[in-house]
């Protein structure tokens, strides 16, 4: 077990890729390839959600070439993003982000650290590594033409009627939530006057609708109003956003990867809110002089010629993107032994972690890490790497304890696993 601490997260990010499984491997709801869909589609109703499930036949979708061309033009004119592969250091933060991309059900990541340590740059660079998804053209919810759990109401009605859906391929959205955003801007608004006079539910979608099947990033989340944080975390956990005004209720899909960042010197999040983030990454200022020089020089190169700088890292970016895509495909095949599950729960119990979220997140993160490394079996080493990030923010604060919570988690891990 002594080898666990001898392996840095950077070695994980550069591990060899494995070949993709059969071409029929399923992908998660964030990744679909361009294709025509036809034939029978059958979805079974679920408890308390039957109105969002449909059963139809002979539904076909076709790629809209005009919309596709517009997307390509907008992509080329977009502001260049710093390459993820070019970010120096901060391996813990990068690993947490990658694991959430592989398995969005981990529950997002909270990144806390000093000012100017690359938190926002790293998060925004993540969008380049994500595959394109198929969405219904003109739909404000980025509806998935094949999954009713990710469909808006209008799209579901079209599917039920057997109408064709015009679809396009687009990059996954990275939605920024500003600190000054109101609840109506985040959740959406209902036009009460139109509802009363015309008898229709006039709904103006908010940021949660735009973030569906994408990433919602909240910078300085520790300064955001508590009630907005509650709304975000509830939507992220349930996958749905419900807006209720004057007796009118509207729900729409809101499945997104929630990423928050902040500086602990400016304020802490409530423990109840911290617990809702799947993982927690701590980012520190680089102290090595040579490494600091390298970071400054790389940033200067990017600022002077972003296009040329991005081309330098294009091959590494493509390799990492393929590795992520393969890991997402293989995730469902990754197994974790019962003995490891018991030991994980024992660590959580002995650390007096409230609830069971910690247990579930560790299991998911360890499986995602194994998939990233190209394996179908979780090892104790995988658990040892991810467990500090999964439990650090869930421990009860002791004002007399000066030791980092992550170290306490690691010590307990060795005690249980050896």
UniProtKB/Swiss-Prot annotation:
Quaternary organization: The magnesium chelatase complex is a heterotrimer consisting of subunits CHLI, CHLD and CHLH.
Family the entry assigns: Belongs to the Mg-chelatase subunits D/I family.
Compartments, record wording: Plastid, Chloroplast
UniProt-recorded Gene Ontology molecular function terms: ATP binding; ATP hydrolysis activity; magnesium chelatase activity
Name the record gives this protein: Magnesium-chelatase subunit ChlI-2, chloroplastic
EC nos: 6.6.1.1
Pathway: Porphyrin-containing compound metabolism; chlorophyll biosynthesis
One term under GO cellular component: chloroplast stroma
Sequence positions that bind ATP: 113-120
Organism: Arabidopsis thaliana
Entry keywords, A to Z: Acetylation, ATP-binding, Chlorophyll biosynthesis, Chloroplast, Disulfide bond, Ligase, Nucleotide-binding, Photosynthesis, Plastid, Transit peptide
InterPro entries, per the entry: AAA+_ATPase (IPR003593), CHLI-like (IPR045006), ChlI/MoxR_AAA_lid (IPR041628), Mg_chelatase_ATPase-isu (IPR011775), Mg_chelatse_chII-like_cat_dom (IPR000523), P-loop_NTPase (IPR027417)
Function in brief: Involved in chlorophyll biosynthesis. Catalyzes the insertion of magnesium ion into protoporphyrin IX to yield Mg-protoporphyrin IX. The reaction takes place in two steps, with an ATP-dependent activation followed by an ATP-dependent chelation step. Possesses low affinity for ATP and may play a limited role in chlorophyll biosynthesis, and contributes to the assembly of the Mg-chelatase complex.
UniProt-listed CDD domains: AAA
Regulation affecting activity: Redox regulation; active in reducing conditions, inactive in oxidizing conditions. Thioredoxins f and m mediate the reversible reductive activation of oxidized CHLI2.
């Amino acid at each position: 077990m002594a080898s666990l601490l001898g392996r840095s997260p950077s070695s994980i990010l550069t591990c060899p890729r494995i070949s993709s499984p059969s071409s029929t491997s399923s992908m998660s709801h964030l990744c679909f390839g361009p294709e025509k869909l036809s034939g029978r589609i059958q979805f079974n109703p679920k408890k308390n959600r039957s109105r969002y499930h449909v059963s139809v036949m002979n539904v076909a979708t076709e790629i809209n070439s005009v919309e596709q061309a517009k997307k390509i033009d907008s992509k080329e004119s977009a502001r260049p993003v710093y390459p993820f592969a070019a970010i120096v250091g901060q391996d813990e933060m990068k690993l947490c982000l990658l694991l959430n991309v592989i398995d969005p059900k981990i529950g997002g990541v909270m990144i806390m650290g000093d000012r100017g340590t690359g938190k926002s740059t790293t998060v925004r660079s993540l969008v380049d590594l994500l595959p394109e998804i198929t969405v219904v053209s003109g739909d404000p919810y980025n509806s998935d033409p094949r999954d009713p759990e990710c469909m808006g109401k209008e799209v579901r009605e079209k599917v039920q009627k057997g109408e064709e859906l015009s679809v396009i391929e687009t990059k996954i959205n990275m939605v920024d939530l500003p600190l000054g955003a109101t609840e109506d801007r985040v959740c959406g608004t209902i036009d009460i006057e139109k509802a009363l006079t015309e008898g229709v539910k006039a709904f103006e979608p908010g940021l949660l609708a735009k973030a569906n099947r994408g990433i919602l990033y909240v910078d300085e989340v520790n300064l955001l109003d508590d009630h907005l944080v509650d709304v975000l975390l509830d939507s992220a956990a349930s996958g749905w956003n419900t807006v209720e005004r004057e007796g009118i209720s509207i729900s729409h899909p809101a499945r997104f990867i929630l990423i928050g960042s902040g500086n602990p010197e400016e304020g802490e999040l409530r423990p109840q809110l911290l617990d809702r983030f799947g993982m927690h990454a701590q980012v520190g200022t680089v102290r090595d002089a040579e490494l600091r020089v390298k970071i400054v020089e790389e940033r200067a190169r990017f600022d002077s010629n972003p296009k040329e700088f991005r081309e330098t890292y294009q091959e590494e970016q493509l390799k990492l993107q393929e590795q992520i895509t393969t890991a997402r495909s293989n995730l469902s095949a990754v197994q974790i032994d019962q003995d490891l599950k018991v030991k994980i729960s024992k660590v959580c119990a002995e650390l007096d972690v409230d609830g069971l979220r910690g247990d579930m997140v560790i299991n998911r993160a360890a499986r995602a890490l194994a998939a990233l490394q190209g394996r179908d079996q979780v090892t104790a080493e995988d658990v040892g790497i991810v467990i500090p990030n999964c439990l650090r923010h869930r421990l009860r604060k002791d004002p007399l304890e000066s030791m980092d919570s992550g170290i306490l988690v690691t010590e307990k891990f060795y005690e249980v696993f050896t």
